[in-house]
């Protein structure tokens, strides 16, 4: 992938950009095999990759510069701002949005937040696109509600320029820390969620719910999990750390009983909406801590699917699963190091199948799907 920002030394986020994709995949596969070297693996499936540029469905832009000439991008470690509107990871559809946002920031008088001085209002611009219908969600992260009335007043101009903006919100993040969002979300549009479609499964994206940033690879990840589950004798499963329900909604059949657990209320609202649309009445989604939910249960289903954050599922959940011994565990991980550590804590299981998903090209990161079978 060619990137003028990288070539000019202005951005180093894509550290592997100079390596061809096949080389990147080889290095990631070697890393994964090294991490799982202590465990016999029955089947290594071929790694899955997607487009090498224009694949991201989300931009998280730090706003800096002045109200008349805002910059959208990032701050270097020394505080120097960098405009990243031309980043080739973003699809072409983002360019007109960035182009309209810059004059809009001036029109609405949204002074960029100055980290050094702790002054200003506009901290971040968060933009998400649904690939299924091209609808977009735009979030203004502000320090306070001081400029909210001005923003509302100027908004019709922006909406006229960009009819693809279906969901627009203001998020209030009052703390002087590098935190992307606060708890308060103020909707400026009637529509409150975007719909995305992967493999004919509707998935909803709300402002404060996590959603995979690489739709091409994420849709293949969910489809693969569905195919693996279809091959197993499973009538009851748990989907722990389920997010908006991507895995559970793909894996469920009309006669399957499924419980999805996720701590984030917004994500659970999305999952419930999808299940209702699909007419899957035996799916139950609850906003709870996944570990606390599981360890309080006196029995387990045949299959437990886990998709934890980078820290992994942790010892308490590993101990519980070892004791209760579901027949199958499917582990989806964005951090193979913690996954390998967790598998060590599941001594009664063997690795049936492993597949790498290149969700984050040009970086060392990747996603991995592993099927564990009780010995």
Swiss-Prot record:
GO MF, one example: rRNA (uridine-C5-)-methyltransferase activity
First-level EC class: transferase
CDD domains: AdoMet_MTases
GO BP: rRNA base methylation
Highest taxon above the source species: Bacteria
Enzymatic reactions: uridine(747) in 23S rRNA + S-adenosyl-L-methionine = 5-methyluridine(747) in 23S rRNA + S-adenosyl-L-homocysteine + H(+)
Positions bound to S-adenosyl-L-methionine: 212, 241, 262, 307
Gene3D superfamilies recorded: 2.40.50.1070, Vaccinia Virus protein VP39 (3.40.50.150)
The protein's Enzyme Commission number: 2.1.1.189
Active-site residues annotated for this sequence: 334 (nucleophile)
Key words, A-Z: 4Fe-4S, Iron, Iron-sulfur, Metal-binding, Methyltransferase, rRNA processing, S-adenosyl-L-methionine, Transferase
Residues engaged in binding [4Fe-4S] cluster: 3, 11, 14, 87
Family stated for the protein in its record: Belongs to the class I-like SAM-binding methyltransferase superfamily. RNA M5U methyltransferase family. RlmC subfamily.
PANTHER family from the UniProt entry: RNA M5U METHYLTRANSFERASE, TRNA (URACIL(54)-C(5))-METHYLTRANSFERASE
Record's function text: Catalyzes the formation of 5-methyl-uridine at position 747 (m5U747) in 23S rRNA.
Protein name: 23S rRNA (uracil(747)-C(5))-methyltransferase RlmC
Organism: Escherichia coli O157:H7
Taxonomic placement: Bacteria, Pseudomonadati, Pseudomonadota, Gammaproteobacteria, Enterobacterales
């Amino acid at each position: 992938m060619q990137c003028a920002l990288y070539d000019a030394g202005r951005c180093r986020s894509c550290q592997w950009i100079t390596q061809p994709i096949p080389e990147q995949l080889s290095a990631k596969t070697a890393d994964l095999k090294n991490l799982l070297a202590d465990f016999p693996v029955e089947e290594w499936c071929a790694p899955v990759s997607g487009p090498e540029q224009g694949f991201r469905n989300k931009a998280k832009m730090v706003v800096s510069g002045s109200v008349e000439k805002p910059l959208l991008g990032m701050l270097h470690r020394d505080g120097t701002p960098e405009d990243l509107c031309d980043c080739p990871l973003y699809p072409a559809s983002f360019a007109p949005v960035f182009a309209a946002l810059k004059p809009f920031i001036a029109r609405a008088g949204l002074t960029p937040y100055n980290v050094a001085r702790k002054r200003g209002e506009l901290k971040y611009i968060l933009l998400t696109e649904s690939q299924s219908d091209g609808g977009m969600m735009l979030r203004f992260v502000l320090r306070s509600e001081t400029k909210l009335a001005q923003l509302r007043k100027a908004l019709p101009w922006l909406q006229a320029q960009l009819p693809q903006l279906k969901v627009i919100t203001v998020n209030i993040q009052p703390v002087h820390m590098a935190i992307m969002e606060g708890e308060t979300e103020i909707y400026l549009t009637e529509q409150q969620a975007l719909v995305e479609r992967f493999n004919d499964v509707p998935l909803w994206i709300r402002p404060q719910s996590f959603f995979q940033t690489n739709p091409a690879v994420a849709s293949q990840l969910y489809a693969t999990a569905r195919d693996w589950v279809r091959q197993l004798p499973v009538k009851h499963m748990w989907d722990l750390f389920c997010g908006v329900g991507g895995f559970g909604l793909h894996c469920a059949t009309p006669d399957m009983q499924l419980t999805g657990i996720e701590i984030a209320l917004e994500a659970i609202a999305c999952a419930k909406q999808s299940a209702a649309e699909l007419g899957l009445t035996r799916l139950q989604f609850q906003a709870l801590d996944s570990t606390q939910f599981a360890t309080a249960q006196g029995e387990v289903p045949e299959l437990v699917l886990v998709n934890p954050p980078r820290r992994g599922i942790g010892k308490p959940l590993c101990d519980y699963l070892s004791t209760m011994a579901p027949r199958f565990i499917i582990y989806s991980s964005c951090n193979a190091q913690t996954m390998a550590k967790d598998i060590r804590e599941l001594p009664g299981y063997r690795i049936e199948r492993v597949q790498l998903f290149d969700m984050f090209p040009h970086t060392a990161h990747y996603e991995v799907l592993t099927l564990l079978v009780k010995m």
